[in-house]
C-alpha cells in the first residue's frame, strides 16, 4: 500500500500485515490517505499515479478544513482534492461521515450510550447520524449558527454547545407552541414571517438557548 499520511499510519498498516511502499512504481494495490500537516507534494503525486494505475483509494475523512488557534487551515479533504483532480473516481471513506470507523470505535470501547462531539455538520454530525449516535455540535470550529440554520435534516445535531464544557451541562429543553419556541426562559417568536428573539440576558448560556429555540422554528422539514 502507498500511504499518504503520517508515519503513525505506516505503523498501523504494518501491524495489520500490510507492506507500505513509497512510490507508484512499486505497484501498490491500494492508496491510503490520512491527514498530514507536513505532507510533501511529491507524495500526493505518487498517490495520484498509483490511483491512475488502478490502485484502490481509501481515505480517513473528507474534512476540507481544520480549525487552529489562528484560523482555518486546509484539511485532508483539500489533500484528497489534489489527487482527485487527476483521477475520475472518489476515495472510499473509512471515517466520518461513513460508518465503519465510528462503529468500530464504539465496539472496541464497549459504548452503550455514546455521544459524538464535532464542529462540522457535513462530516461530524452527518457521520453521527449515519451511525445512529447522539451528536453534540460545538461552536469552536468550521461551522457556525448560520450553517445550522441552513442544515439539511441529516446534518442537524441533537445538542448544541459552546465547547466541550457542554458535556457537563444539562441538555437544553425546548418547548414549541404555535409560532413560538422557548428554551430555559429564552423566547423566539415568528411574526409575519420574521423571527423575533427575546433573551432574558445575553450571556453565552442564554444565547445558546436562544439559538436552540430559533432552530426549532427554522427546522420545519
Q: What are the functions of these language-model segments?
A:
Residues 2-221:
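Asp-based, Mg2+/Mn2+-dependent phosphohydrolase catalytic module
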Amino acid at each position: 500500500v502507498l500511504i499518504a499520511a503520517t508515519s503513525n499510519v505506516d505503523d498501523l498498516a504494518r501491524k495489520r500485515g500490510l507492506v507500505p511502499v513509497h512510490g507508484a512504481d512499486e505497484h501498490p494495490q491500494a492508496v491510503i490517505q490520512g491527514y498530514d500537516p507536513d505532507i510533501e507534494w511529491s507524495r500526493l503525486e505518487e498517490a495520484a499515479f498509483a490511483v491512475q494505475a488502478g490502485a484502490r483509494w481509501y481515505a480517513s475523512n473528507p474534512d476540507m478544513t481544520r480549525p487552529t488557534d489562528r484560523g482555518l487551515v486546509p484539511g485532508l479533504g483539500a489533500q484528497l482534492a489534489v489527487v482527485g483532480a487527476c483521477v475520475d473516481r472518489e476515495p472510499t471513506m473509512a471515517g466520518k461521515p461513513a460508518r465503519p470507523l465510528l462503529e468500530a470505535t464504539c465496539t472496541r470501547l464497549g459504548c452503550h450510550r455514546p455521544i459524538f462531539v464535532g464542529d462540522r455538520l457535513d462530516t461530524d454530525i452527518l457521520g453521527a447520524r449515519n451511525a445512529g449516535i447522539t451528536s453534540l455540535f460545538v461552536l469552536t470550529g468550521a461551522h457556525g449558527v448560520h450553517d445550522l440554520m441552513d442544515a439539511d435534516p441529516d446534518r442537524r445535531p441533537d445538542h448544541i454547545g459552546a465547547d466541550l464544557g457542554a458535556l457537563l451541562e444539562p441538555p437544553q429543553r425546548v418547548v414549541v407552541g404555535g409560532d413560538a419556541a422557548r428554551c430555559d426562559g429564552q423566547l423566539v417568536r415568528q411574526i409575519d414571517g420574521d423571527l423575533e428573539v427575546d433573551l432574558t440576558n445575553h450571556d453565552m448560556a442564554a444565547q445558546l438557548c436562544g439559538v436552540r429555540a430559533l432552530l426549532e422554528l427554522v427546522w420545519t422539514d
